[in-house]
A protein has these predicted regions:
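Conserved beta-hairpin
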Residues: 44-65
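A conserved beta-turn-beta hairpin within the catalytic core of GNAT-like acetyltransferases
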Residues: 69-77, 87, 109
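Conserved GNAT acetyl-CoA-binding A-motif
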Residues: 96, 103-117
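Hydrophobic adenine-recognition pocket in adenosine-nucleotide-binding enzymes
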Residues: 67, 80-82
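Conserved acetyl-CoA pyrophosphate-binding loop and the N-cap/start of the following alpha-helix
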Residues: 86, 90-98
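Residue-level recognition of the GNAT/N-acetyltransferase active site
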Residues: 83, 118
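Conserved catalytic-core motifs of GNAT/GCN5-like acyltransferases
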Residues: 110, 114-116, 126, 131-150
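Short amphipathic alpha-helix that is part of the acyltransferase structural core
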Residues: 1-33, 151
Length: 151
């Protein structure tokens, strides 16, 4: 069913419990409550997709996306997610269009705007001017171990 018209994009980001649930529902890696609260507090800009007719907190948030960074030199597009039962309707593109508009209005011309594309999502991001950087540069990840962890 195509219910794009029943979905509202709002310039706000879900609370930590909703964020954590949506990450799991969309196949993103799980985050602890502490990590979610800290991270969301540092969002520069974020959007949520809300399904009309749903009770808040009962599956109403069906998508999200946000921008993090230092607000001047580096911006990172993160947490682009649409619930699986709503994928394939252009909702990811709506999220990216909102983030792209915000970046165009707020990122200085010399800023570096980046993201990590999972699988075929790179095709969506290419529509907004993102290009693969390999082999000139590659993405690397560091897994934080936190206080008290042993190596």
């Amino acid at each position: 069913m195509n219910d794009v018209g029943l979905v509202e994009l709002v310039e706000s980001f879900p609370d930590a419990p909703t964020y954590r649930r949506l990450r799991i529902e969309t196949g993103l890696s799980p985050k602890s409550q502490e990590a979610a609260e800290r991270g969301l507090a540092n969002t520069l800009y974020g959007v949520s997709l809300l399904k009309a007719g749903e009770v808040i907190g009962m599956g109403r948030v069906i998508g999200m996306g946000r921008v993090v960074g230092d607000g001047g030199t580096v911006f990172v597009v993160v947490d682009i997610a649409v619930r699986r039962d709503h994928q394939g309707q252009g909702l990811g593109k709506r999220i990216m269009a909102a983030l792209d508009a915000w970046l165009r209005a707020n990122a200085p011309p010399s800023a570096y705007v980046m993201l990590i594309a999972d699988g075929d999502a790179r095709h969506l991001y290419a529509q907004f001017g993102f290009a693969e950087t390999a082999p000139a540069s590659i993405s690397m990840a560091y897994v934080a171990r936190g206080p008290g962890s042993s190596d």
